[in-house]
């Protein structure tokens, strides 16, 4: 059972899930933000992958993504930063990102790196369900990634 299922099956009364955009406010602060959130009782963290056109997000997340990109955040850097995160953090980590940067990185490579870093799930708001079923589900399932 993955960490997300364990959390929701734990009979915990108060579950707190927090979103933040990787690379914001500083490029090198992502791991520290994750550590600090867990230390202060957050149950699950949604790590935003910055994108230049976050169409489904409000102005606050748009601005955070813009700042993160200005700071130099990319998927390559994010995966490098998180490669040892499971030595320090045990709560579920979920990526939220748009399809474009994931496709530029390569969907299978993205899934492989998620597994290497211990990412528990991925939210891709602009991935149509039918496209997921037809093209990406088999890859995600091969790596055990919950999309």
Locations of regions flagged by a protein language model:
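Active-site mouth loops of central-metabolism enzymes
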Residues: 16-30, 94-106
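Active-site-adjacent beta->alpha loops and helix N-cap segments on the catalytic face
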Residues: 1-10, 27, 52-61, 70-85, ...
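Conserved, mostly hydrophobic/aromatic
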Residues: 18, 37, 48, 114
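Short beta-strand/loop segments at the ligand-binding rim of alpha/beta enzyme cores
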Residues: 11-17, 88-98, 139-147
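Catalytic cores of alpha/beta
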Residues: 27-37, 110
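Residue-level detector of anion-binding/catalytic polar loops
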Residues: 43-44, 92, 120, 146
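Conserved beta-strand positions in the central sheet of alpha/beta enzyme cores
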Residues: 17, 43-46, 123
């Amino acid at each position: 059972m993955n960490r997300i299922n364990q959390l929701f099956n734990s009979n915990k009364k108060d579950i707190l899930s927090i979103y933040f955009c990787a690379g914001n406010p500083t490029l090198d602060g992502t791991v520290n933000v994750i550590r600090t959130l867990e230390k202060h009782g957050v149950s699950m963290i949604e790590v935003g992958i910055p994108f230049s056109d976050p169409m489904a997000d409000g102005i606050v997340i748009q601005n955070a993504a813009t700042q993160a990109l200005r700071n130099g955040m990319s998927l390559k850097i994010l995966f490098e930063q998180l490669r040892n995160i499971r030595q320090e953090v045990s709560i579920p980590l979920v990526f939220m990102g748009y399809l474009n940067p994931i496709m530029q990185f390569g969907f299978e490579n993205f899934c492989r790196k998620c597994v290497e870093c211990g990412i528990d799930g991925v939210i891709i708001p602009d991935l149509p369900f039918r496209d997921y079923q037809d093209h990406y589900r088999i890859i995600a399932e091969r790596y055990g990634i919950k999309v």
